[in-house]
Amino acid sequence: MAGHSQFANIKHRKGAQDAKRSKVFTKLRKEIIIAARSGPPTPDLNPRLRAAIASAKAENLPKDKIEAAIKSAQGNAADDSYEEITYEGYGPGSTAIVVHALSNNRNRTAGELRHIFSKHGGKLGEKGSIAYLFDHVGLVVYKAESIESFDALFNLATSLGAIDLEEDGEGEDKVYAIICSVEDFGKVRDGLYAQYSDGELARLSWRPKQRVLVDSPELNTKLMNFLNDLEDTTTYSMLRGTFHLWVSGT
């Protein structure tokens, strides 16, 4: 019986891992489709597509799946008619949250989000109810280990028009985030890519006008559970924020 139970546990864990991997692949595929539709379907001519493909390869999305997603972007299949939608709401502890979603069904996505916010004691808000607490900015992220000189990166970024460069994380998880205006995003991204190749992330994002430290262990746990539920929802490609999400307290 013990052996049978252990085998069942292994199957359960593998099933959970496979399900999580499938969700990640789904998100990556959506991002590739949106990126391919945002410009030329050729990575060399489309920085956003190049970044999406790099992210997909980092997660070991098979090459044939990547190529199929790019090809799908050129078709008219209803299931692949994804659009980018921004939602706003209050999460645990009245933290202001901006969520960026890729969806082919607005009603379904809004319903899923409303359920997640409500489940964690939050509330999905109307358009404009939260966004004023944030600045809409361009964001380019590099792993620190891929940059030889922070000063050289800083000097190049500022010469291209970046307004800030932030550090986050430690060790192999340390990253540099270059912040710029929406208007200068293309110039900053392309200039950085020309010097340092493609980064970990390059897209428009939301930055809080005022940072609030979450120093309550209980609230931190609630926030992490809330964000995990958001990330587990297959209708999202990426959460806006400090390299995935910025939270602005109120």
From Swiss-Prot:
This is Probable transcriptional regulatory protein AM694. HAMAP family: Transcrip_reg_TACO1. Residues 1-22 are annotated as: Disordered. Keywords: Cytoplasm, DNA-binding, Transcription, Transcription regulation. The lineage of its organism: Bacteria, Pseudomonadati, Pseudomonadota, Alphaproteobacteria, Rickettsiales. One of its GO terms (molecular function) is DNA binding. The keyword DNA-binding applies. It comes from the Bacteria.
